């Protein structure tokens, strides 16, 4: 008789057919064997005949539990490291290697393999480890009509010049010029993809992804290793290289002075509403940027950023600085728009922010896309400018409140509310 032992992970219901805990069939088994195999506990673990198993089950999925699940408390050979992450449409859901323009935007994790296996069973030295990529919450999503995503992962060797660093998110050029050292056997729409590898000691980048880009999802990555392996997320540190414009009125040429006098009128200042009209006329002449001008909200936050005297308007010097910034914004927007569509998609936005001097982690890119992209993941020129101005303003405020560069500030309620309505 062939028997199979099964565990119900919820531990509430057990098999009641042949060879269940109370089945008289156990009376025909040697008492010592019966005592060892048939412990009677309501623990969700039970025996059934293999023929009954084949009759009652039509599909078998291997569930990879943690390495110590079926061992005693005193013996745990394999080490487990676990990390949770997510893919977000338009920012961190870059799809597989078939999509080189977006693949690099997937979450990245560094695995440091330091010690070789003690027993080299196949005669080949190296570090043995398993990588399991699990989709989370898919049962919940299935109730909403969504099926499992098709998932997989790639493993890349970290270049020597970048080893030891965890604050650099590897970019598009790296993946265009570097082959994967290992990868999952396949991309498949199962809850978990798991593969076993052996690699020399060193640092490796793990990139989990869905097969196609723009698939929202949460995941868990588990790394099982015979020896301890360091495993952590790789992401850009927050940086802002903001050029402080030190402009005096003597630096402003006569042509710009005449232009300003013509635009500003008798009060010699430009309000947000006047600025909106000016920019509408200027941008209407551009064929390479699709825009109807800038919204009054964007114009107001631009005025607020540069209004040093609190009048709510821009004087000559302030307007000159703003005009220089707008020209810079136009240049970046045009250069990043590689398909010459006159617009920018959310994936191009990450590169545009870097060109503007901002390095941001994935979490912030997710927030920016949610805030400034439309449902087609397009970021128009108005939202692009508004995003840059808000970021610059927030960085400058933080710097003023943190003169010692500690990376932390304290705010009272009124200050928090004032900054929140920017």
UniProtKB/Swiss-Prot annotation:
Subcellular location: Cytoplasm; Cell membrane
Tissue: Ubiquitous.
Gene Ontology MF, one: calcium ion binding
Main location, first listed in the record: cytoplasm
Residues the entry annotates as binding Ca(2+) 1: 318, 380, 383
Region entry Linker, spans: 237-251
Region forming the signal peptide: none
Known cofactor(s): Ca(2+)
EC number: 3.4.22.53
EF-hand domain sequence ranges: 294-327, 324-359, 389-422
Region listing for Domain IV, in residue ranges: 252-422
Region feature (Domain III): 67-236
Annotated Calpain catalytic domain residues: 1-66
Residue sites binding Ca(2+) 6 per the record: 307, 309, 311, 313
Active site: 8
Subunit structure: Forms a heterodimer with a small (regulatory) subunit (CAPNS1). Interacts with CPEB3; this leads to cleavage of CPEB3.
UniProt-recorded name of the protein: Calpain-2 catalytic subunit
Lineage: Eukaryota, Metazoa, Chordata, Craniata, Vertebrata
């Amino acid at each position: 008789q062939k028997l199979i032992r099964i565990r119900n992970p919820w531990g509430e219901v057990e098999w009641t057919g042949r060879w269940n805990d109370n089945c008289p069939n156990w009376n025909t088994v040697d008492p010592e064997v019966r005592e060892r195999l048939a412990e009677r506990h309501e623990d969700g673990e039970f025996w059934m005949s293999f023929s009954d198993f084949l009759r009652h089950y039509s599909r078998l999925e291997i569930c990879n539990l943690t390495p110590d699940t079926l061992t005693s408390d005193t013996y745990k050979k394999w080490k487990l490291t676990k990390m949770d992450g997510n893919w977000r449409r338009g920012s961190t859901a870059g799809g597989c290697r078939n999509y080189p323009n977006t693949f690099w935007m997937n979450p990245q994790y560094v695995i440091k393999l330091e010690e070789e296996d003690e027993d080299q069973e196949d005669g080949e030295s190296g570090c043995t480890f398993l990588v399991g990529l699990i989709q989370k919450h898919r049962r919940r999503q299935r109730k909403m009509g969504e099926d499992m995503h098709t998932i997989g992962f790639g493993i890349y060797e970290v270049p020597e010049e970048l080893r030891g660093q965890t604050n650099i998110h590897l970019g598009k050029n790296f993946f265009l010029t570097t082959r994967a050292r290992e990868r999952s056997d396949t991309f498949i729409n199962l809850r978990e993809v798991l593969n076993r590898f052996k690699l020399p000691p060193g640092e490796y980048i793990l990139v989990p992804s869905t097969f196609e880009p723009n698939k929202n999802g949460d995941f868990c990555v588990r790394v099982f290793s015979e020896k301890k392996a360091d495993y952590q997320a790789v992401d850009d540190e927050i940086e802002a290289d903001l050029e402080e414009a030190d402009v005096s009125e003597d630096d402003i040429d006569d042509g710009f002075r005449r232009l300003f006098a013509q635009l500003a009128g008798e009060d010699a200042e430009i309000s947000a509403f006047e600025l909106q009209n000016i920019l509408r006329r200027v941008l209407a002449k551009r064929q390479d940027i699709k825009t109807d001008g800038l919204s009054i909200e964007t114009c107001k936050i631009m005025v607020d950023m540069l209004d040093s005297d609190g009048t709510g308007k821009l004087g000559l010097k302030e307007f000159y600085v703003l005009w220089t910034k707008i020209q810079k914004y136009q240049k970046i927007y045009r250069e990043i728009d590689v398909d010459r569509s006159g617009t920018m998609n959310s994936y191009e936005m990450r590169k545009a922010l870097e060109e503007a001097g901002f390095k941001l982690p994935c979490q912030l890119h997710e927030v920016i896309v949610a805030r400034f992209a439309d449902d087609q993941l397009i970021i128009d020129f108005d939202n692009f400018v508004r995003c840059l101005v808000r970021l610059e303003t927030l960085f400058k405020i933080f710097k003023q409140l943190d003169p010692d560069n500690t990376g932390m500030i304290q705010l009272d309620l009124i200050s928090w509310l004032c900054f929140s309505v920017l």
